Structures are given as C-alpha cells and as structure tokens.
C-alpha cells in the first residue's frame, strides 16, 4: 500500500462529536481554546454544534450549556485559516437552522441521515447548495447497508447537489475490509469531482486502520477528534492518525507536534471521564450499536439495575438506530421486567 504523496483533508470532530461524552456542556472558553489550537495546528475544517447537530437541544438529546449560535459565534471570528462545519440531521435540524448557520459564517454543512434514508435529505442539501455552501451527504450507521445499497443512497445525495459523500461508521463496527468494500463501491459510482469521506469510531480500536483503508479506497476527507473525544470509545484519535499519515507520506497539512499538544494540553483535561475502550464501548462496536447510545444506556442501566452492556446488546439485536434514544429506557425496562419475572418463576 503506497499512499505517499496522497493529499487529504482532515476534519476535526472534537467540538461536535465530543459534545456527547461532555453531555453537551462544553463552555465557550473550552470551545475557543480548542478551536484556536486546532487552527494553529493546521486543521482545515472544524465541526461545531450540539452533538446531535443543529437544533439538537431537546429533552430527547440533551440540553447544551449554550445555543448553537452562541458556540458558532464564539469560535468562527477567532479562526485564521480553518473553516467551520455544522452537522444537520433532517427531523432534528431545519432549513431555518441551516440558514442561521450560514449567516453566522458556517462554511460546510453535513446533512446526515440513516444509511437507508437519503431521500429525507433532499430539501436540506438543495438549500445548502443554493447558499453555495460546501455540502456533504453523511450516511450514518453504514455497516447496516450493503455496498450496493450505499451506492444507491450516495447517488441520491449526489443528485440533490451534495459535492461530498461520507460513509460513516457510527457504531465503530466496521473492519478495514468492510470499509474498503463500501467506499470502493461508492467511489466507483460517484462523479469524479464528487469527494468521498470517512467518519470512524474507535469502539474496536480500528479508527486509524479504517481511516487508512478509506484513503486507499479513494476517500480524501477523513474525520477524527483530538484525544479521540467523541461518542463511545471516541472518534479516530486525530493526533495518532496524523502521525501515521506522516509516517506513510500522506499529506494532511497538520503539524504532528501541535496536534498532540492540543490533545494532551487542552482536550484531555476537559474530559469528564477517560475516553477509552471499556467493556460498554467495546460492546457498541461488537454489536453494531450507535455510539451516542452509550451514556443513555448507562443511565438506564443504573435506573433499572440492568448492566449497560446487556442493554446495548439488546439494542443491537433490535437494530435500533440514531434517533431512537427514547427507546433505550423502554428497552431497559422491558429487560428488567423479564428478569424479574424469570427470577419469580425460578423462586416458585
């Protein structure tokens, strides 16, 4: 595998996916410090929103410390080189949220749907293109669709106007061969000028390996987070990925030492708990469960006396996807009732 001289765009998730383990409670000062550090390190694209995207503030997804507008307004004026992106999930974020983000100076909008539901993105992608934004179609939980199925969904998003398509391993479930099969098929099907991206999670410790596999399959945009701060066991750790790229001769434009300093000096100290591959995060990857379900499952487990791991396995068995957070407590309650009934039978 010789990728020497290949140039890619690194996209940082610390201030968006990292909102999940922070329970959306990042301060404006934390946002400013990390964003300016990333900018100084040469990261060209930084995502800033509620963990569930524009408009995510709700009972279902969690109330943030500040509004999206406050976060974006705090960060964008400080950046010298980097551009800011925002995530938008149709059904959570609206066209009005999109217009507001554009007015605040957001450069890139990533319209995210489940990997079989690209058709719900048409209105938002079309509006973003009308506003002349860098417009990304973001196919979540991509392990749940075949390469052929992803091709159909990617081509829909491309037809709506997306100039980049992302294959997203939201559960950290995929292995390098899975990544190559899916991204290779999509790359072959898209127009040559349409870019291809990959978003990985580290729930099987495959974030870096999968990202390299994605580049090999034709991806030129890769997501990561400083110190891996993100849902589950975190995103692909950006400082590690940049170092591997440096070793391989892949050109990121990111300073290998400065990105380490951002991770170690700014991001690690603001973690509420270590982002690591514990048994629950590992279960996300093994069972193919949406990464941001982790803290919801832990809370439900504490409430009903059911191990979070058992809840996550059941969510995977049921094929739950992003947007069904309200079903996690229902699943925990169902398991608790079933176990209580079984214990009663055994005692009889």
Curated annotation (Swiss-Prot):
It catalyses: (S)-4-hydroxy-2-oxopentanoate = acetaldehyde + pyruvate. It comes from the Bacteria. It holds the Pfam family DmpG_comm. GO terms for molecular function: 2-isopropylmalate synthase activity; 4-hydroxy-2-oxovalerate aldolase activity; manganese ion binding. The active site is at 20 (proton acceptor). Substrate binds at residues 16-17, 170, 199, 290. HAMAP family: HOA. This is 4-hydroxy-2-oxovalerate aldolase 3. It comes from Burkholderia lata (strain ATCC 17760 / DSM 23089 / LMG 22485 / NCIMB 9086 / R18194 / 383). The lineage of its organism: Bacteria, Pseudomonadati, Pseudomonadota, Betaproteobacteria, Burkholderiales.
């Amino acid at each position: 595998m010789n990728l020497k001289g290949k140039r890619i765009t690194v996209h940082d998730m610390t201030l968006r996916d990292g909102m999940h383990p922070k329970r959306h409670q990042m301060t404006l000062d934390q946002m400013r410090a990390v964003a300016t550090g990333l900018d100084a390190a040469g990261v060209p694209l930084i995502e800033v929103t509620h963990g569930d995207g524009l408009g995510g503030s709700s009972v279902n997804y969690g109330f943030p410390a500040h509004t999206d507008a406050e976060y974006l307004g705090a960060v964008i004026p400080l950046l010298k080189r980097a551009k800011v992106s925002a995530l938008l999930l149709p059904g959570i974020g609206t066209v009005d949220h999109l217009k507001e983000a554009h007015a605040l100076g957001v450069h890139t909008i990533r319209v995210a749907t489940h990997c079989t539901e690209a058709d719900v993105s048409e209105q938002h992608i079309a509006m973003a293109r009308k506003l002349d934004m860098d417009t990304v179609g973001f196919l979540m939980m991509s392990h749940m669709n075949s390469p052929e199925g992803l091709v159909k969904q990617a081509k829909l998003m491309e037809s709506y106007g997306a100039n980049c398509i992302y294959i997203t391993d939201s559960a950290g479930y995929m292995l390098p061969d899975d990544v190559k099969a899916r991204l290779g098929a999509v790359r072959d099907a898209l127009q040559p000028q349409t870019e291809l991206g990959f978003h990985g999670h580290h729930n099987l410790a495959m974030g870096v390996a999968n990202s390299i596999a994605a580049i090999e399959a034709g991806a030129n945009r890769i997501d990561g987070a400083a110190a891996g701060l993100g849902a589950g066991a975190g995103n692909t750790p950006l400082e590690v990925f940049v170092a591997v790229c440096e070793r391989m001769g892949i050109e990121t434009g990111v300073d290998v030492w400065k990105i380490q300093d951002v991770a170690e000096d700014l991001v690690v100290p603001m973690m509420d708990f270590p982002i690591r591959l514990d048994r629950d995060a590992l279960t996300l990857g093994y069972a193919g469960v949406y990464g941001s379900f982790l803290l919801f499952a832990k809370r439900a487990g504490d409430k009903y006396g059911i191990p979070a791991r058992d809840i996550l396995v059941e969510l995977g068995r049921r094929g739950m996807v992003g947007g069904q957070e309200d079903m996690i407590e229902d699943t925990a309650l169902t398991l608790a009732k079933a176990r209580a009934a079984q214990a009663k039978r055994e005692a009889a």
